[in-house]
């Protein structure tokens, strides 16, 4: 099995090339998507300014209060069904899910989180409606049909929760014992010194996470990739905006994080 994560940057720019490439892998893939840019757009239309939290180590997450949660679920629902409908137009039977459907992804709500405030001090704040994944029913994700999964989980109390899409992709890949995890974004891979880094070991990825060379979402991707590679899963970070992006990733494009290079 392969796990394909369609990043929000791809979803909001042009996901058509990924979608057109998916029929080739419909019998052995699970698709997970993001869509934070649409969440931001809808929030601003409603007069709500998106809020983000910076955590120790430089990782950034969305602060999700009740109103933001409603917009988050709405945006992810639209993206999910857009992908499913597009696949239907290509003759692929696909099933769009959130983690709440069939209890596919159960998470525990983070009631408190540690953040770095604007003065650089650590403090504990309310966690909002953000979850830490506790269980994935991977048997419900096995094709056929091709499953398209949104990063929305359910708690044991029946709460809808925002979960990180990259973390979800990693957890699905781990539980499914996937051969490869493909993270598609709007960049060609990890770029250092103006060039794409073609190969990394898990240890090299970990060092970069701790350095100042890598920032934002790439830091989280490398952290997840390092953990996955240690389990024997090959991780590819590459562009979802090129022709046949899944083919390209499997044929050497992007940055490959592999246990033994």
Swiss-Prot record:
Top-rank lineage group of the source organism: Archaea
GO cellular component terms, semicolon-separated: cytoplasm
BP GO terms, sorted: arginine biosynthetic process via ornithine; L-arginine biosynthetic process; lysine biosynthetic process via aminoadipic acid
InterPro entries the record matches: AceGlu_kinase-like_sf, AcgluKinase_fam, Asp/Glu/Uridylate_kinase, LysZ
Record's catalysed reaction(s): [amino-group carrier protein]-C-terminal-N-(1,4-dicarboxybutan-1-yl)-L-glutamine + ATP = [amino-group carrier protein]-C-terminal-N-(1-carboxy-5-phosphooxy-5-oxopentan-1-yl)-L-glutamine + ADP; [amino-group carrier protein]-C-terminal-gamma-(L-glutamyl)-L-glutamate + ATP = [amino-group carrier protein]-C-terminal-gamma-(5-phospho-L-glutamyl)-L-glutamate + ADP
Residues the record lists as binding substrate: 35-36, 62, 162
Function: Involved in both the arginine and lysine biosynthetic pathways. Phosphorylates the LysW-bound precursors glutamate (for arginine biosynthesis), respectively alpha-aminoadipate (for lysine biosynthesis).
The protein's Enzyme Commission number: 2.7.2.17, 2.7.2.19
Disulfide links within the chain: none
Top enzyme category: transferase
A single GO molecular function term of this UniProt record: N2-acetyl-L-aminoadipate kinase activity
Pathway named in the protein's UniProt entry: Amino-acid biosynthesis; L-lysine biosynthesis via AAA pathway; L-lysine from L-alpha-aminoadipate (Thermus route): step 2/5; Amino-acid biosynthesis; L-arginine biosynthesis
Positions bearing the site annotation: Transition state stabilizer: 5, 221
Protein name: Putative [LysW]-aminoadipate/[LysW]-glutamate kinase
Organism encoding this protein: Pyrobaculum aerophilum (strain ATCC 51768 / DSM 7523 / JCM 9630 / CIP 104966 / NBRC 100827 / IM2)
Localization of this protein: Cytoplasm
A Pfam short name: AA_kinase
HAMAP family on file: LysZ
Keyword set, alphabetical order: Amino-acid biosynthesis, Arginine biosynthesis, ATP-binding, Cytoplasm, Kinase, Lysine biosynthesis, Nucleotide-binding, Transferase
Family: Belongs to the acetylglutamate kinase family. LysZ subfamily.
């Amino acid at each position: 099995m392969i796990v394909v994560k369609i990043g929000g940057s791809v979803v909001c720019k042009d996901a058509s090339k990924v979608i057109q490439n998916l029929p080739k892998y419909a019998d052995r893939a699970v698709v997970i998507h993001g869509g934070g840019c649409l969440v931001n757009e809808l929030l601003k239309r409603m007069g709500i300014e998106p809020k983000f939290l910076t955590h120790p180590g430089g990782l950034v997450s969305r602060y999700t209060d009740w109103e933001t949660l409603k917009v988050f679920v709405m945006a992810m629902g639209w993206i999910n069904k857009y992908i499913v409908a597009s696949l239907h137009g290509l003759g692929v039977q696909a099933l769009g899910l959130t983690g709440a459907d069939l209890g596919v992804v159960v998470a525990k709500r983070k009631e408190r989180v540690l953040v770095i405030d604007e003065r650089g001090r650590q403090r504990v704040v309310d966690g909002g409606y953000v979850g830490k994944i506790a269980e994935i029913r991977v048997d419900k994700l096995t094709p056929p049909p091709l499953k398209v999964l949104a990063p929305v989980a359910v708690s044991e109390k029946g709460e809808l929760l925002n979960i990180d899409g990259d973390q979800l992709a990693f957890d699905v890949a781990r539980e499914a014992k996937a051969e490869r995890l493909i993270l598609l974004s709007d960049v060609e891979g990890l770029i250092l010194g103006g060039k794409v880094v073609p190969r990394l070991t898990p240890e090299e990825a970990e060092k970069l996470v701790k350095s100042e060379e890598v920032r934002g979402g790439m830091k989280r991707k490398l952290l997840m990739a390092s953990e996955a590679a240690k389990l024997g899963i090959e991780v590819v970070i590459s562009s979802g905006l090129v022709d046949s992006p899944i083919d390209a990733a499997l044929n050497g494009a992007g940055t490959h994080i592999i246990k033994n290079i």
